[in-house]
Amino acid sequence: MSSSLGKEKDSKEKDPKAPSAKEREKEAKASGGFGKESKEKEPKTKGKDAKDGKKDSSAAQPGVAFSVDNTIKRPNPAPGTRKKSSNAEVIKELNKCREENSMRLDLSKRSIHILPSSIKELTQLTELYLYSNKLQSLPAEVGCLVNLMTLALSENSLTSLPDSLDNLKKLRMLDLRHNKLREIPSVVYRLDSLTTLYLRFNRITTVEKDIKNLSKLSMLSIRENKIKQLPAEIGELCNLITLDVAHNQLEHLPKEIGNCTQITNLDLQHNELLDLPDTIGNLSSLSRLGLRYNRLSAIPRSLAKCSALEELNLENNNISTLPESLLSSLVKLNSLTLARNCFQLYPVGGPSQFSTIYSLNMEHNRINKIPFGIFSRAKVLSKLNMKDNQLTSLPLDFGTWTSMVELNLATNQLTKIPEDVSGLVSLEVLILSNNLLKKLPHGLGNLRKLRELDLEENKLESLPNEIAYLKDLQKLVLTNNQLTTLPRGIGHLTNLTHLGLGENLLTHLPEEIGTLENLEELYLNDNPNLHSLPFELALCSKLSIMSIENCPLSHLPPQIVAGGPSFIIQFLKMQGPYRAMV
């Protein structure tokens, strides 16, 4: 039985000015009704070139995919704030813009079906934003806006563009994301002043050879389409800095990609790539390369020439080895993700290959050993993820990993943690769940910066008293072990907010648990020998979630136990010696 404690239900206030059904119907007819809110946030209404936002899903967190155009999004409005517009209101906005000689017009989120032809009069405009409307086409008159530099049409239902747009000789940014284009409109290839082109999330299947005409492009995003190949002419985009072709159906890249030597960000994740051309080594400016979720079985040696590379993500391919000395050649590499591949050993190349690495993710491979000394030069290595491998032990120099901040060793076959874990003095997160640990080293108490310790699903029978020294600990997970008691020193963990003790053999909780003044979540479920709870538990004033399923608690009145956690806490408050304090 799990419960949220002390939560009050939000009262629902009625809108005193709610429109009648007839009024709503009349308004709906005038505005054309509302469309569903798009799940993608709106881009900012600025015509600046977009840069990759760090730390997507996908990214630039190490081991996480990155999206090169996600920094131009702006938050969705609060519910109920979407604007309704009749055609008359839109015309009114156009007139106001003309009278004030405004250079910027934002008609986003107006449920516009058809843009009035009078738009042609606003020849002074340099920026026009039409995000999140219901446009299926644009009037030819938009071609009269000869000073336009930014045209934002994201989140509409466009299937084509008028040929008159080729009059927009000054257009630099064109945003066509989230429309219904089945091809790149031919007029787009004639907009040779474009520097930024967003075509994400359409239904495009091909990129024509005419892409070569857009020689000024620095940003091209065509992710989330159905593109099966890129033309050789892509290599003529010599000013390209960011190329995002993620989430398509590419099996190969043209060798001409090597001519795009200015590229810094290349996102190819979630395709069907079987190989990479050797010419990729010509991308001397490349700093971020995303190749996760493809079908690669090898990486070309030429990649070693990409000496500016800082982030390399190869997650979920079929790679079992890397070219020797590849990593040592990438002297600026700080984030390396090799998760979900076929590695049985660490890459060949010795300690020097990790000298600049900050984050290393090798989760879900078949590695059974971390070589001794492999991190002896890894002075900045802060995050290591070895989850879901076949480790049975840790190297003898384990205690020298003094820069480590986050260490994930979950889902291996470790039977013990070396005593010299005490040397990992920078450690803040330690994940050891799903191993074969029967006890913990006393040196664990030296990890004074530890905020999270996860020991779920091991074979622990007790905890060392030194755990009391982990005073910064906020999350302690001990679920599914064989604990019968807790050390009294657990009461010193006053910063603890989450304590997982479910699926153990606990017979009681120490009264010191009452000193956990910041405890918010307590999981006691499935402890078949837990018959009572200490009155001191009532002193945990911030406790909001407590789980007691499948605990007998026979020393408490049955009707109290049946009432659930909130009843139990109330009982402990009122019946215990601390009722005057709570």
Swiss-Prot record:
One of its GO terms (molecular function) is volume-sensitive anion channel activity. Transmembrane segments: none annotated. It holds the Pfam family LRR_8. One of its GO terms (cellular component) is nucleoplasm. Coiled coil: none annotated. Keywords: Cytoplasm, Leucine-rich repeat, Nucleus, Repeat. One of its GO terms (biological process) is regulation of MAPK cascade. Residues 1-29, 36-57 have a biased composition (Basic and acidic residues). A motif (RVxF motif) lies at residues 63-66. It is found in: Cytoplasm; Nucleus. LRR repeats lie at residues 101-122, 124-145, 147-169, 170-191, 193-214, 216-237, 239-260, 262-283, 285-307, 308-329, 332-353, 356-377, 380-400, 403-424, 426-448, 449-470, 472-494, 495-516, 518-540, 542-563. InterPro entries: Leu-rich_rpt, Leu-rich_rpt_typical-subtyp, LRR_dom_sf, LRR_domain-containing, LRR_R13L4/SHOC2-like. It comes from the Eukaryota. Core component of the SHOC2-MRAS-PP1c (SMP) holophosphatase complex that regulates activation of the MAPK pathway. Acts as a scaffolding protein in the SMP complex. The SMP complex specifically dephosphorylates the inhibitory phosphorylation at 'Ser-259' of RAF1 kinase, 'Ser-365' of BRAF kinase and 'Ser-214' of ARAF kinase, stimulating their kinase activities. The SMP complex enhances the dephosphorylation activity and substrate specificity of PP1c. PANTHER family: LEUCINE-RICH REPEAT-CONTAINING PROTEIN, PTHR48051. Component of the SHOC2-MRAS-PP1c (SMP) complex consisting of SHOC2, GTP-bound M-Ras/MRAS and the catalytic subunit of protein phosphatase 1 (either PPP1CA, PPP1CB or PPP1CC). SHOC2 and PP1c preferably bind M-Ras/MRAS, but they also bind K-Ras/KRAS, N-Ras/NRAS and H-Ras/HRAS; these interactions are GTP-dependent and both SHOC2 and PP1c are required to form a stable complex. Interacts with PP1c in the absence of Ras GTPases. Interacts with M-Ras/MRAS and RAF1. Interacts with ERBIN; disrupts the interaction with RAF1 and Ras, preventing the activation of the Ras signaling pathway. Belongs to the SHOC2 family. Contains a N-terminal RVxF motif that is important for interaction with PP1c. This is Leucine-rich repeat protein SHOC-2. The lineage of its organism: Eukaryota, Metazoa, Chordata, Craniata, Vertebrata.
